Amino acid sequence: MAATRRPGRNHLFVPGPTNIPDRVMRAMMVQSEDHRSVDFPSLTKPLFEDTKKVFGSTEGTIFLFPASGTGIWESALSNTLARGDKVLAARFGQFSHLWIDMAQRLGLDVVVQEEEWGTGAKPEKIEEALRADKNHEIKAVMVVHNETATGVTSNIGAVRKAIDAAGHPALLFVDGVSSIGSLPFKADEWKVDCAIAGSQKGLMLPAGLGVICVSQKALKAAEGQSGRNDRLARVYFDWEDQKKQNPTGYFPYTPPLPLLYGLREALACLFEEGLENVYHRHAVLGEATRQAVAAWGLKTCAKSPEWNSDTVTAILAPEGVDAAKIIKHAYVRYNLALGAGLSQVAGKVFRIGHVGDLNELSLLGAIAGAEMSLIDNGVKVTPGSGVAAASSYLRENPLAKA
């Protein structure tokens, strides 16, 4: 008789959704309540302020939407821009591609800088394009901070310097869905006008809560759209409705109550660990994963170390090996969920997510499972080599700075 239950637990190592801490799951086990009660602001008002901290902001305004990160992409574009407005965007992976596609479908004129997959946004090219835009027709620059399809992180600080060097007034929009809460993010210092996050990655929650940190400059741009016949349509994602309700602790429509309680607990987890320790932990886990990849004799999709992501590693399968089979075998045989290759890299890479609530032994389990699946699929890997390399690195590099 075939087994109908798999013992143990599924090992989730995709780059999102991520593992949810037990205490966060417990925090979300709440009874329904009146979201217009006099008590409700005691939950929400501190949330608006505390959420700013993971964005590296004291000056921004936080809006929380029942949505995914994709919805917040639309919120940023539709509130600040008008049909036909020109925006500059680099395309170097599936998610930068999808954001560009959304902008085009909304009626924006997107100037696309095509970059090789495995690299990221090039600040020098952005500066060049902005310098050439003498009439300041480009209204915004769109950049994906951490491209999970290829395991690449772009340098947003350098992008800001490029915009400033060009003397250009364009808004800066940054997709931080797979970086915020895991990698250093400095919305105020980098003068990010719309910083976008989702609940299901570094914030360690289920999907369903979209977060945006909006600068004063972006708020003014949104106000400037009022009354324009060519303004982009928006209703559900309209900031004005949020601005009227949020200061009193309420929302213009029913919020996802369990996710708000979960967000409060997830932020407490991050703050108790210390954000600098969170970032350091992700850096150590990312490098340990890359040590394992090198020991296997394989390469990452990231073309050079400067592009390495510390939340996900995309690993190139050897020539002639279908990465999809490695992923399927890992799931069926070892109950390990690895990330699939997307679009241009479909069947060419498998991805190990190392984002969220993880420690050394969590990661080593994923590396062991990936290693066994590689060997089972005929890849010539020395058994134990990746685990040994990663564990050696982890022993020498504690996850906490102090």
UniProtKB/Swiss-Prot annotation:
Keyword Transferase: yes
Consequence of gene disruption: Mutants cannot grow on Cl compounds (methanol, methylamine, and formate) but grow normally on C2 compounds (ethanol and ethylamine).
N6-(pyridoxal phosphate)lysine: residues carrying this PTM: 201
Keywords attached to this entry: Aminotransferase, Pyridoxal phosphate, Transferase
Enzyme Commission number: 2.6.1.45
Pfam family, one: Aminotran_5
Reaction equations catalysed: glyoxylate + L-serine = 3-hydroxypyruvate + glycine
Name of the top EC class for this enzyme: transferase
Keyword Ribonucleoprotein among record annotations: no
Cofactor (UniProt): pyridoxal 5'-phosphate
UniProt GO molecular function: alanine-glyoxylate transaminase activity; L-serine-glyoxylate transaminase activity; L-serine-pyruvate transaminase activity
Pathway: One-carbon metabolism; formaldehyde assimilation via serine pathway
BP GO terms, sorted: glycine biosynthetic process, by transamination of glyoxylate
Family: Belongs to the class-V pyridoxal-phosphate-dependent aminotransferase family.
The name this protein goes by in its record: Serine--glyoxylate aminotransferase
UniProt source species: Methylorubrum extorquens (strain ATCC 14718 / DSM 1338 / JCM 2805 / NCIMB 9133 / AM1) (Methylobacterium extorquens)
Gene name, Swiss-Prot/TrEMBL: sgaA
